[in-house]
């Protein structure tokens, strides 16, 4: 199976979350902890995607194929690119294959609250800035404080042209 076939499926497992507040394209969500694979590098996002894709395609200690999931997390910070794949919920830190590539970190994320704004099309820096501003304005209006940097997530294969789903997200201080 080629890369395009593996990332063109619409039947991916999606990371679980609970919607706390929903208003138009804005949501506050609670995300329970999940297992993730992360690459931090000064390479472009395509290089990071390739490393993570190779890991789930069998470049790991068990030579095991791991199913693709959604979303893919992406952040640019101080000339570094960070990309994370969520691992299928059937895996634990103890059961998942270890990457052969030392630049890939497998970790268990903490349960947290996030605010997001959803948008369509292909994401780019202009759309990220526009929707980031919109998200920060909405959080300010609701008097909700942020924690950490903004980042974006993508739910679709690059080969999907229509009805794409992207989101700008940020961790928030929230008590349910």
Q: Where in the sequence are the language-model features?
A:
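A solvent-exposed interaction/effector surface
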Residues: 4-176
């Amino acid at each position: 199976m080629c890369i395009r076939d593996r990332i063109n499926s619409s039947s991916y497992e999606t990371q679980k979350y609970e919607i706390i507040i929903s208003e138009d394209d804005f949501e506050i969500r609670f995300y329970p902890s999940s297992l993730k694979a992360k690459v931090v590098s000064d390479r472009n996002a395509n290089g990071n995607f390739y490393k993570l894709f190779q890991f789930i395609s069998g470049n790991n200690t068990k030579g095991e194929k791991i199913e693709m999931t959604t979303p893919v997390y992406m952040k640019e910070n101080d000339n570094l690119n960070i990309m994370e794949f969520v691992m299928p919920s059937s895996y634990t830190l103890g059961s998942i294959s270890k990457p052969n590539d030392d630049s890939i970190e497998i970790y268990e994320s903490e349960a947290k609250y996030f605010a997001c704004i959803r948008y369509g099309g292909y994401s780019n820096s202009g759309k990220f800035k526009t929707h980031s501003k919109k998200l920060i304005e909405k959080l300010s209006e609701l008097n909700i404080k942020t924690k950490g940097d903004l980042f974006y997530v993508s739910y679709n294969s690059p080969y999907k042209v229509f009805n794409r789903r992207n989101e700008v997200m940020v961790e928030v201080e929230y008590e349910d």
